[in-house]
Amino acid sequence: EMSTAFKSADILLPKNADMSKWAVVACDQYTSEPEYWADVEKITEGAKSALNLILPEVYLEDDNVDERIADIHKNMDSYISEGVFEEYKDAMIYVERTQSDGKVRAGIVGAIDLEEYDYRKGSKSAVRATEATVVERIPPRIKVRRGAPAELPHIMILVDDTEKSVVEPLEAHKGE
């Protein structure tokens, strides 16, 4: 049997959310632009948003980082108990996003086996980093995950698939 590092997962998606306020960029973006994140806070204020469930890494050095992490965990608990999410058990989800130039990019939401991952430069593992990992950011990421009732991964896996046999065939099954 062929094994793969990519697997199905129990996936939570917001139901009845204003997606213009729900979706935010990954926590490791705009790390030198606190004004970007301040604008996102203004835009999402009072709304259910993924922003309330992540720790933007621009705040990693702040004195109140532990308080922010505690708030993230509380928000996760309340979103789950309030029924904000629809759960898709043992699933993979086909997604499309339209870039600003109009090009549509397709992908699959799933899980990777972290035992197959190695972020070190030159790694030959099944799953490896395409950009340098900032090792100093790992401890706070672990702190956010420890005791958290939900995971909000922010990675994108690129697949070497010259035959276009992984993602492209799924387009015909949209909506199933």
PLM region descriptions:
Residues M2-E176:
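A cross-family signal for N-terminal binding/gating loops and helix N-caps
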